[in-house]
Every structure is written in structure tokens, then in C-alpha cells.
Amino acid sequence: FQLSNDFQVTRLMHKYLPEDQKSLGYATLLEWRNILYTPPSSVLNVKKTQVRMGAVQWQMREFTSVEEVLKQVEYFVDALSDYKSDFALFPEFFNAPLMGLTDQMDQTRAIRFLAGFTEQFRNEMSEMAVSYNINIITGSMPLIEDDRVYNVSYLCHRDGRVDEQRKVHITPHERRDWVIEGGDKFQVFDTDAG
């Protein structure tokens, strides 16, 4: 009956029912494939055909603490996450108002002061990327490495990974006033959105 109704023999199973003497414990697994059934597609490992980007228009204003800036960052991340954005893109030197927290009149020292917050911003924004399920492009921040200052932006993936890109083409102002050095390579990053 089953074979005449398009059931297919999938496999023979040994010791399926050991107490059945007539079959010697064997069973036949049959499968009927419904041609009208479409299985639900997996949301994992799917190539996206559209990507939603959220560009943050950041108002430069006075901030009195890193926490205050991070609170504003989280406001935008939360809003863009509600819109199901794949990426939140922050502007270059979005944390620059924190240079006002130092009494340094020397611009080189002020940018080095600002670089002291970069790791905290990177870590906090990486946690937000995971919490809000959105990839965050941090906008550039100063980074000190081997006593040199670089202008670096981070890609905080929603799975917790963090990639970085150093600005290659430094503006004359950055080079002259902040003594920022340029990076020497372009990175290409794989994300869950392409």
C-alpha cells in the first residue's frame, strides 16, 4: 500500500524492535514527500539582498562625562535597532567635545587626552552592538600606539567581534595640529549583511 502511494524507502533499521521474531528486529523507515509543502527558510546564514544603514546626525554640544556621551550613543543605537537597521554609523570624532574636560590649551595634549577614552568607547559600543543586535561603525577616535596617534574607526559586529580601520588619508589639520599619523592599509570586513 505505502509503496503504491509514493512512499520511499529511506533506510532499513536494525534492532528497532528486537522482540519481534517475524522481522528479526528490523524495521523499514518510509518517507512520503509532500510536493505541496515548502519548509520554512532558515534565518541563519542567509545572504541579504537589502541592507539598512542608519547614519547618526550628531549634534556637537558640551558633555561633562564619558557616561553622558555613551548615554547619547545608546539613544541612537536603540532607535536604529527599533528600525531594524543592520548598521549604525557614527560620525568622525563624535567624542571630540570631551576634550573640553581637560585644561590643556595645547591641541596635541588635548587629542592625547581624548585618546584615553577610546578603549572604553570601543568596549561599550561593542557591548551595545550585541545587546541591540546591530552592527555599529563607531566613527573615528584617536588611538595611541607606540607613542603615535592614529585616527581609527571600529566595526563592532552584533556577534561580538571588533574590527578596526585606521584612517589612511589624514587631513592637513589633523597632521599639523594633532600630529596624527595615517594608517597604511585598507581593510575589507565580512559582516552578516555582506
Predicted regions and their residues:
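A short acidic, glycine-rich active-site loop
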Residues: 1, 108-123
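Terminal substrate-recognition subdomain of acyl/acetyltransferases
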Residues: 1-46
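Beta-strand-turn-beta hairpins that frame and shape the catalytic cleft
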Residues: 44-53, 188-194
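Active-site beta-strand/loop signature of hydrolases that rely on acidic residues for catalysis
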Residues: 53, 72, 77-107, 129, ...
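N-terminal phosphate-binding loop and adjacent alpha-helix
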Residues: 57-79
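Surface-exposed, active-site-proximal loop segments in enzymatic domains
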Residues: 98-113, 150-155
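A short, hydrophobic beta-strand-centered structural micro-motif
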Residues: 116-144
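Active-site catalytic loop in hydrolytic enzyme cores
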Residues: 127, 143-194
